[in-house]
UniProtKB/Swiss-Prot annotation:
This is NADH dehydrogenase [ubiquinone] 1 beta subcomplex subunit 1. Keywords: Electron transport, Membrane, Mitochondrion, Mitochondrion inner membrane, Respiratory chain, Transmembrane, Transmembrane helix, Transport. It comes from the Eukaryota. InterPro entries: NDUB1. It comes from Pongo pygmaeus (Bornean orangutan).
Length: 58
């Protein structure tokens, strides 16, 4: 039991840092989805595009 506790005490960083990265990527993706939904309703981007005109957001 002491060995398991020692391993957890020594290597907690190796678990929390990747978990933080994964959670950050997930939250970033959700934020992008919300901003995309707003962009499609925005008055700025509501106009029709000219022929051969690219979208202004990427």
């Amino acid at each position: 039991m002491v060995n398991l506790l020692q391993i957890v005490r020594d290597h907690w960083v190796h678990v929390l840092v990747p978990m933080g990265f994964v959670i950050g990527c997930y939250l970033d993706k959700k934020s992008d989805e919300q901003l995309t939904a707003f962009r499609n309703k925005s008055m700025l981007f509501k106009r029709e595009l000219q022929p051969n005109e690219e979208v202004t957001w990427k």
